[in-house]
């Protein structure tokens, strides 16, 4: 199992022209995440995405260190990004090739240099996710659920050790949200899941409640979700 460590991490952002030169997006946070499935929950704008993005270097700490399996994200960014897959809320941002098969092929470019073998491997990936019939379709003609599944298939095809998913079910209908949720929770990889779906959070092994740029509760999902519900209802 993987290990994600945050050592006194602070994230600040400049606010050009704003009343204050810098805002704190994440207050000093120290975490040691070794559980298989870690949920990040909390209100809009609380800092969940920021926390999730720190894990693969999409957000850099202003101070402190993020370490994934012993690799400092700031120093070994490329190596970390090969081990840490990322799935966004809106899969469109990560589907960049004209057709479904080409998109999976792009994900596989580091693993298989030979074009034909890569296309074959891409077809196998699609088949294993039930997407074989869509191979030659434009990604823009897919439904939201198909697109999210394709984005996930592309990332998982690279066999990452950790998967970070930032609200991956938010745009999906109930059936697709359940399908993607079940898939994520069944992965062998360590999962960091930022989500507003508290039922999904409850099925994780650990939950962190983020509020106003700080982790305010951390522990068993049932307790953390109960705490969130109690505080959210005022
Ligand atoms: N680069 C930046 N510059 C200024 N402010 C930022 C920057 N990135 C994030 N923020 C702010 O930091 C706060 C936390 O944002 P973040 O996206 O991490 O929240 P979130 O919990 O994922 O929200 P949501 O549930 O709405 O997706 C928000 O107020 C956001 O506007």
What do the PLM-derived regions correspond to, one by one?
Residues 41-43:
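The feature captures the beta-strand-to-loop junction immediately N-terminal to the Walker
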Residues 56:
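Helix-to-loop junction immediately C-terminal to a conserved catalytic motif
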Residues 64-75, 80:
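Conserved ABC transporter NBD signature motif
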Residues 116-134:
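Conserved ABC ATPase "signature" region
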Residues 138-142, 146:
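Conserved ABC ATPase signature
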Residues 163-166:
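Catalytic Walker B motif of ABC-type/P-loop ATPase nucleotide-binding domains
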Residues 214-234:
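Conserved beta-strand-loop-alpha-helix hinge in the C-terminal portion
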